[in-house]
Amino acid sequence: MLMLFVFGVLLHEVSLSGQNEAPPNTHSIPGEPLYNYASIRLPEEHIPFFLHNNRHIATVCRKDSLCPYKKHLEKLKYCWGYEKSCKPEFRFGYPVCSYVDMGWTDTLESAEDIFWKQADFGYARERLEEMHVLCQPKETSDSSLVCSRYLQYCRATNLYLDLRNIKRNHDRFKEDFFQSGEIGGHCKLDIRTLTSEGQRKSPLQSWFAELQSYTQLNFRPIEDAKCDIVIEKPTYFMKLDAGVNMYHHFCDFINLYITQHVNNSFSTDVYIVMWDTSSYGYGDLFSDTWNAFTDYDVIHLKTYDSKRVCFKEAVFSLLPRMRYGLFYNTPLISGCQNTGLFRAFAQHVLHRLNITQEGPKDGKIRVTILARSTEYRKILNQNELVNALKTVSTFEVQIVDYKYRELGFLDQLRITHNTDIFIGMHGAGLTHLLFLPDWAAVFELYNCEDERCYLDLARLRGVHYITWRRQNKVFPQDKGHHPTLGEHPKFTNYSFDVEEFMYLVLQAADHVLQHPKWPFKKKHDEL
């Protein structure tokens, strides 16, 4: 498989064969299935797409009377979109553009294609098309290194890491962490191409700093017994953004999910190693999310200090702050929304974390207000706004404060996913919009002059977004007082005109009731 994969890269035909999925058991005990279908653990809607890229499993399913996915065998033309043979009409959704951003293009069709490549499964296709071999194996027992452009994603086999002489300090992403001979493999290294990929060298944008010392070794690390530890399981290396901020940390998770697509494996029987060159720990308020990606605790790189460690299969994951990456500071064409990629990500995470939809409720719209107990961006007349909402009998209103010490992240997700209108001030908590149902609306009560952040995230996810528009009807407590920047709209609190607030919420409700996926078709005049 290794040689096929590498030669496939050379031919620009990256194998999509489920490299990490368990092989079918063709000699199973009578009365038992030929494959462990329960290990797939994907939402029902994703199964045809999985089988499209794992035809060996589809073939077994066709022969197996106990396969639960037979109904999907007639849908094997369905594809995510990054596969070379994928026809547009069978893709997992396609973005919609309501107008043409003339700064980018001049037709709706080309606008949709641009957005699909920027932020949908077209983004994964571009990474696959960039793949090239940097270290070529000669035999099946050799090592290999295959990377996308700028070393934003890499895949290595029989990787050797020598951490016996490592010196750690406060720097989480030390650039000269490895010296020559301390990271590498037994393969023919294209050193010129490797060193030419450093244009985006930066801690959370590229793996260049970590792999620039990759060395062509004169020994086979595993075969020649040069390893103190051999890691048999596939391992994902990740450099993580801030684990205390949902917006930044979910840049980690979405890029891990895209990496799984590029790698064509959604197995949770994998290790995840946090690449951190410091001796510090890592504060993670959203650690439950890892259960969607691995069966094991996340491993800190320092766990392997003072040892030579060899990884049979290693993946260097796409990173959270890549230039033109997703979704931190991503320049997006205007007028387009609804990516299949972000919808699939939300479905994937919710399914694996067992977060279910308990509604919607006939005759009710579930409204959730996200309160803030922080010093800034509080809603000063919150009670007044809530009382106004409660005058509408259709609204079922709840106020939540997503404080991790009082409400676990899984409970937060259950509330969010069972919300039809989600209201909150500008802040990382609005990242919850990723997990709203498709028909929902998010109301960023006030964006504090940061106009694109959650508007763009809502566009990516495909949920309706509104925010406050009339400046004469929002009342800041003062001009704001940033500790170093002086006056700043994010560093104060706000009151809002009740009538204008209700007008905007009713607009959001109107969207919910008219959404194609809203199951109740009653007239909304009662609002």
Curated annotation (Swiss-Prot):
Pfam families the UniProt entry points to = Glyco_transf_61
GO molecular function terms attached to this record: protein O-acetylglucosaminyltransferase activity
Q: Per the Swiss-Prot or TrEMBL record, what residue ranges does the short sequence motif Prevents secretion from ER cover?
A: 524-527
Which GO biological process entries does UniProt record here?
protein O-GlcNAcylation via threonine; protein O-linked glycosylation
Q: Which UniProt keywords apply?
A: Disease variant, Endoplasmic reticulum, Glycoprotein, Glycosyltransferase, Signal, Transferase
Q: Which reactions are catalysed by this chain?
A: L-seryl-[protein] + UDP-N-acetyl-alpha-D-glucosamine = 3-O-(N-acetyl-beta-D-glucosaminyl)-L-seryl-[protein] + UDP + H(+); L-threonyl-[protein] + UDP-N-acetyl-alpha-D-glucosamine = 3-O-(N-acetyl-beta-D-glucosaminyl)-L-threonyl-[protein] + UDP + H(+)
The EC number of this protein is 2.4.1.255
For this UniProt entry, which residues form the secretion signal? 1-17
Where does motif Required for optimal activity map? 295-297
Q: Which residues are glycosylated?
A: N354
| Cell compartments where the protein resides | Endoplasmic reticulum lumen
Q: What is its main location?
A: endoplasmic reticulum
Question: Mind telling me which GO cellular component terms the entry cites?
Answer: endoplasmic reticulum lumen
- Superkingdom: Eukaryota
Q: Its family?
A: Belongs to the glycosyltransferase 61 family.
The record's function comment reads: Catalyzes the transfer of a single N-acetylglucosamine from UDP-GlcNAc to a serine or threonine residue in extracellular proteins resulting in their modification with a beta-linked N-acetylglucosamine (O-GlcNAc). Specifically glycosylates the Thr residue located between the fifth and sixth conserved cysteines of folded EGF-like domains.
- Disease linkage in the record? Adams-Oliver syndrome 4: A form of Adams-Oliver syndrome, a disorder characterized by the congenital absence of skin (aplasia cutis congenita) in combination with transverse limb defects. Aplasia cutis congenita can be located anywhere on the body, but in the vast majority of the cases, it is present on the posterior parietal region where it is often associated with an underlying defect of the parietal bones. Limb abnormalities are typically limb truncation defects affecting the distal phalanges or entire digits (true ectrodactyly).
Q: What is this protein called?
A: EGF domain-specific O-linked N-acetylglucosamine transferase
